[in-house]
């Protein structure tokens, strides 16, 4: 953490995660086969290119610190079968800087307690979901990456989002692909969290694809003439219902637990079959 802070990463948290395996003790009391899963989060960058540079630099620094202490580190998505893999949840947002210097979050609605997102915000998430099958090869491109995306380990398997049951109750659904992060008292914090990347995802390509897909959805939302309520209705549609932009035969929003409340057959029918 100190090494990352020195380089301007501004680490916000570092803690043990649910992965890892129990260590062993030999006959003389020595501990061996120690394997823990750790999480590090650092402050976002307003420049997507700088954010990708930071991710690459952090990986190099972490590996070097471990090496100096006689330890090994793995950034594989699924280094050990049967336990939780390693993800790299990627947060993306959209803001505008006015001539006055004021920054406005373009995803946030005018009233945080009466709506989830702005028109641009709905277009953003709809674009990512509608185009995710084209994005996915740039996110999960290896067998190791797909091995992580399995039910039972809080890793996403369906192209679906969660907004929350009510605008005043932010979502805490950890079973979806893209989450909406909101702070009712801080509209500038409104952003999306993509939960499928792993530490070896090429973040340069991933972020580029995300914003291109988002732009496609934003163009639809803005040019459709629909307001936030109508766009929310399309995002929340049921499978089989017609839509102006999203596919007819699938759903894109779920406030239930995708793993616990659906069988695999139901998930495939409602949200589409996953690529893995």
Task: Locate each region found by the language model.
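Glycine-rich, acidic/polar active-site loops that bind/position phosphate-bearing ligands
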Residues: 1-276
